[in-house]
Amino acid sequence: MASNSLMSCGIAAVYPSLLSSSKSKFVSAGVPLPNAGNVGRIRMAAHWMPGEPRPAYLDGSAPGDFGFDPLGLGEVPANLERYKESELIHCRWAMLAVPGILVPEALGYGNWVKAQEWAALPGGQATYLGNPVPWGTLPTILAIEFLAIAFVEHQRSMEKDPEKKKYPGGAFDPLGYSKDPKKLEELKVKEIKNGRLALLAFVGFCVQQSAYPGTGPLENLATHLADPWHNNIGDIVIPFN
């Protein structure tokens, strides 16, 4: 009996088409077949590093969750929710910052490093794309930003639903993407992935500027492409002289 069952399993594994008929004698062998639920669970179990166990508190339900938490920072549920929110907010800021750095430099209006030099001058006037910014002195801008950000953060902190704090919808969804739940979940994953890429890009801009002070990312890239063997990160990290 056992040998018959094993033979049935072996044949079914090699010739799965034999199971397609409801009259097949191999159906009674109870061979488990993959189904949509199993495939979904397999995808959910994707790890950030093969062989590393997924923490129990990272179950794959959050957008972009691949079980990455080597320091165990999210073990406390309240902290985990706060980190999710903080990551998303920082991702959105980075996605605004990276194009804001690249586009003006690409248009020939200077780089983001030199754009800050006015703030170091007494009575310096801020400009944007060559035009003076109204109320563009440093103390005035700091006061406006402090009041504006304080108001927005206060309003956001009053929301008790963690999902609404991250995805408020309403006026922040003018195209109505949140009306389709399936589409919304897909967009959440795309947002967090693009946001993480933008965070890495901004860190790269900062490192590049520290290595080559006064240069923007596009200028630095052009210099590297002109002579890749001599203009690279190794030229700074490894002291040749």
Swiss-Prot record:
Function as written in the Swiss-Prot or TrEMBL entry: The light-harvesting complex (LHC) functions as a light receptor, it captures and delivers excitation energy to photosystems with which it is closely associated.
Gene: LHCA1
Species name: Arabidopsis thaliana
Induction behaviour: Induced by low light (LL) but repressed by high light (HL). Inhibited by cold.
Recorded family membership: Belongs to the light-harvesting chlorophyll a/b-binding (LHC) protein family.
GO aspect biological process, one term: photosynthesis, light harvesting in photosystem I
Residues noted as binding chlorophyll b 4 in the record, renumbered to the chain: 156
Presequence boundaries: 1-35
Positions bound to chlorophyll a 5: 190, 208
Annotated binding of chlorophyll a 2, by residue: 90
An annotated GO cellular component: thylakoid
Quaternary assembly: The LHC complex consists of chlorophyll a-b binding proteins. Red-emitting heterodimer with LHCA4. Interacts with LHCA5.
Name of protein: Chlorophyll a-b binding protein 6, chloroplastic
Other notes: Light emission at 684 nm upon excitation at 410 and 470 nm.
Subcellular location: Plastid, Chloroplast thylakoid membrane
Keyword Cell membrane included in the entry's annotation: no
Keywords carried by this UniProt record: Chlorophyll, Chloroplast, Chromophore, Magnesium, Membrane, Metal-binding, Phosphoprotein, Photosynthesis, Photosystem I, Plastid, Thylakoid, Transit peptide, Transmembrane, Transmembrane helix
